Amino acid sequence: MDNRRSLAQPSFSNKVIDTNELKNLIVWAFRNYGIARAANMADKLKDLGFHYATQAGISLSLEDLRIPPSKQSLLLGTIEDIKATENKYRRGEITAVERFQKVIDTWNNASESLKQEVIKYFKETDPLNAVSMMAFSGARGNISQVRQLVGMRGLMADPQGQIIDLPISSNFREGLTVTDYFISSYGARKGLVDTALRTADSGYLTRRLVDVSQDVIIREVDCKTNKGIILEDLVDTQKILINLEQALSGRVLAENVFHPETNCLIAHTNQDVSPKLAKEITKAGIKKVLVRSPVTCNSRSSVCQYCYGWNLAHGRLVDLGEAVGIIAAQSIGEPGTQLTMRTFHTGGVFTGELAEQIYAPIDGQLIDLDIESYTDVRTRHGEQALITKKPTQVTIRSKKNQKSIINLSKGTTLLICDGELVSKDQVIAESPRRNRLMTERAQKHVVSDLSGKICFSNLTVEETDNNQYTTRITKTGGLIWVLSGEVYSISDSANVIVHKEDKTKAGTILAQTELINHYAGEVRIHQNTNSSITNIQVITESIVIPGCYIYTDVIHKKESYILETEKKQKFLFKAIPNQKIQDGYTVAELISDTYKTTSGGIIKYLDLNVSKKKTGLDKDAYEILSPGYILWISEETHEINKDSSLILVHNGDVIESGTELVKNIFSKSSGIAEIIEKDGIVREIIIKPGSIYKLSEVYSNNDKSRGFLRPGERLHNNISTDKLVYWEYIENEQMPYILIRPVIVYSIPETKSSLIENLVSQKPSQTKLKLVKRTPFRDGERVKSIEGVHLVTTNLVAEIEHRDDNLISSIEFSAKESGNNYFDLRLSTFETLSIKSIDVNKSEKQQSQTRIIVKNGEYIKPFTVVASTEIIAMSEGTVEEIYSEKNTSRRILIATSSDKKTFNIGKSTVKVSVGDWIRCGDFITENMTSLDSGQIIEISSRSVTLRIARPYLVSNGAILHVDNNALIRRGETLAILVFDRAKTGDIIQGLPRIEEILEARKKTDVLLNPHDILDASFDLYIECGLALYEAARLSFQEIQLLLVKEVQLVYQSQGVNISDKHVEVIVRQMTSKVKIENGEETGYLPGELVELQKIEQTNKAITLRNKINASYRPVLLGITQASLNTESFISAASFQETTKVLTEAAISGKLDWLRGLKENVIIGRLIPAGTGFNMYDNCNGSSLEKKNLTANTNDESTISSVRDDLDDIILDDRTARNYFSNKSVE
């Protein structure tokens, strides 16, 4: 420490201490005077700060928010620019996309200029202003927030990330309008949501990083490698993000560094670079330095001291046993929360600039432009400019002959021409901010602002046919003119009455659609409650069914309609009044209990003919086609589905009605119980009523065990009957018996009964009602029921003879004269003609009107015009075009007086001719300009007539939605412009981008796919004749440097500084494995992932035995995959997919050597880092004199010898080391 103190002479610093200077001051004290004195100084600085802060009493008041006076003039200038852009758009000089981009850039530049004005205003007029002191010192807030307080909020983004082209020109001091407030709310919400999500994402990123690198520990002093990486300035589009001096600090040199001019040795190999030495190296003009790096370190599964370099916390070489992997993970993960959230601390304010502007340093003239270095280009604002093909220079000469040379890089857009005069601080060129800017294809719809006729100008169209439709795409950009006029759409069924060149007045009928009936009948017009007519019915037939009437009654607690005939038979109506009916529809059902049973049972047909399939609209019953009988053997079926232990009766028991079968389930009838059981569960209990006849011996008739017994027939043991019965043979445990069951016979007579005579009208009709008997059950079906069922239903079914889809039949109730509660049943057949809803009371002018020609109740013949819909001209004019195309509806264009404009020119000379297209602002005569765009249609001696039109510029590649000469209505799409749009900042930067790089995602739309680059470079090295190991190592190194640069670009773009070495440690873990293609005699399987060093050692050993080496390819693993494929299965299992990892480890018999921190923490041992790290000898006996403390962790013989002496199955490096130290003591 004394040595260090003598070197550092106190020096006087005369600077304004802001955050950066304060950081430098404390680092200087720490480097030179040690941790205690630096801490003491920091304490004193804090006290000093607080002392003066409290004395000054800095606080914010409304008066401190000073708005720069130049704001108003700046806004007025910007609004003028916007107006000029709008005018260009109206003249058809720029496309909708270019207009949008120009408006956004104009406002963005205004906002930036205002920000500079704010800074300048504060510094010049009020340097001690509280707001500026806080923001510029870094104590609180930043420039972006101050800009919003006293400048303008600027442009905002909507929820989809699209920029709203209406900026917020006010600031918080002036206050926001309602519109401003609403536009602001998008960004504010996004900010809140984003903060919550980013925190979670950042935490997960840190977890993955820690998992992938937790076993990277400094295990030795020097790995003796002679390899390294070249350090140079990190540049992104001409801007140095990390300079060489900053990058060199804390690294160890891989080779001697000599002065390029004097050839003196500046620094030697393996020397660590202090900030002072770094300054010397850069001062000598050296641009590239070879340094040692974690990615080129030869240590197995660790990093050596020299390859890592300084521990940046202490400013000296890293200690042995330092867990640098964890430090690296935290260093990368922790700033993750700051990444994209930076945008949203400012409430979603848009600040992204796509181009860096180059300003003229002096007033003067552009001279000696080398035209060959440039090509013509149209800028994103629609202006003509030049773009550089190679790096070049431009010269500006002032009036005093003073020359100023400006260097332009390749791809810079020059906005001025040769010989053009420029003023100081004028934008003369733009260079792209990032040459790696992500773009996406976007579309913008161009919508017509007026109705009229389409005319193409300088437009080349290419048609491509798809199966369904034709796409028209512009090959060259050009103008679409819309000639103003009134456009009327005509339906396909309408007749156009007017002709081309006809004169029209307001109210002239242009086209007419006639509504015609197909059937004769009586007209019925339906009118809604709101007096609008919706449809007209032509009734072709209406029959009242005689001899019956309808009334309402309550059945089953529900009000229903009842149809009663003269014979007092009642039908329950299933239809509702005015219901449309189809053929086979069941209108009503006879209310009768004739065929109602008391319980379930077995049904058998006797001489009964029924339909084979179920009939009716619902297909729910079989139609009975002829008279006959139904035999009914009743039985009561209880569906139980309970355990057999819960049943209270046994199979074959004779039970009385009311017997409890299962808890709370009782029998309704007496009889013999049959229990149907399956798998210990009682499914059903059947109670069969009847008489029992015991048999003295077992029944020998094997053919039949059940059947019908007719009167006079005898059964076994002389059993006879005087009526039809059903018998069953039942074998009981005690003795067999026969059960005689009663049979009920239901007679089904002929359907043609007296009931139908009145119901069917006498004269032939298209709609009839017929009686149909139906049964829902098949012959022999067992009906499971307790309550009973209707075996046969008698239905009233509609029979409709016509099959015309235009005719509809319906059931109507018409009130009887005798009383309100009784109705006649009417069957009507009618044709419905639907019309657009007509408001009877409406009288104002409209484009189309419908007139009803017939009257309600009138009888009309077929093909009478019932109504006509007319399209009416709204104003006076001339029919100019009647347009019809096969895929579009017909349209009529009427040119009115308001579509033309006449200029009185007096004796002035006309500068235009008939047919010319002119744009707003163009001269018609020497001293008269037109305020409208259009086409000159007439020139007389004293006047010029202009047909008003509107030009729309479309770029090449646009998708056209209209044809030349087509007619278009206002608000319809003319074309879709296809363009490349820069992706929003938070997509190409921030956490998602970092995650994409570190997870090595195989993105298709990204400029660089790291996997492809790795494969390509590996194949290239193999082709060049390099050995497998060298090709893999070099291709890995290429991708490592690329990944490090990519990560650094993202962090630097957000203003976060991270040392390269942290990223290198992570990237080393991602690029350490190779995939076996052919294991040959090594014992490895194809597809297996193995460490590059390990497979190379195996291959060397195999070569010594004259066996075939394994072939492999390098693979890039994302951090998640690298964590799961780590050597330690305990670590991998504790990360993700625990079951899978442990199963695979068990199957392949893996060993865990407990080298990392995580495995040891899980097992509950001391971690092998810090104090737990053992500085033990190499097994080969190399001493500590050289400070080469490499651990030989792979000596199989050592482990096997130790195993004999140890009971513990868990063995790590430390145990082995203790064993060796004990042996050496002996």
Curated annotation (Swiss-Prot):
Gene name of this polypeptide: rpoC2
UniProt-recorded Gene Ontology molecular function terms: DNA binding; DNA-directed RNA polymerase activity; zinc ion binding
Main location: plastid
Residues reported in the UniProt entry to bind Zn(2+): 223, 297, 304, 307
Cofactor: Zn(2+)
Function: DNA-dependent RNA polymerase catalyzes the transcription of DNA into RNA using the four ribonucleoside triphosphates as substrates.
InterPro entries assigned: DNA-dir_RpoC2_beta_pp, DNA-dir_RpoC_beta_prime, RNA_pol_Rpb1_3, RNA_pol_Rpb1_3_sf, RNA_pol_Rpb1_4, RNA_pol_Rpb1_5, Rpb1_funnel_sf
Record's protein name: DNA-directed RNA polymerase subunit beta''
Subcellular location: Plastid, Chloroplast
Origin species: Pyropia yezoensis
Domain of life: Eukaryota
Family: Belongs to the RNA polymerase beta' chain family. RpoC2 subfamily.
GO cellular component: chloroplast; DNA-directed RNA polymerase complex; mitochondrion
Keywords recorded for this protein, A-Z: Chloroplast, DNA-directed RNA polymerase, Metal-binding, Nucleotidyltransferase, Plastid, Transcription, Transferase, Zinc
Complexes and interactors: In plastids the minimal PEP RNA polymerase catalytic core is composed of four subunits: alpha, beta, beta', and beta''. When a (nuclear-encoded) sigma factor is associated with the core the holoenzyme is formed, which can initiate transcription.
CC cofactor note: Binds 1 Zn(2+) ion per subunit.
Gene Ontology biological-process entries: DNA-templated transcription
Catalytic activity: RNA(n) + a ribonucleoside 5'-triphosphate = RNA(n+1) + diphosphate
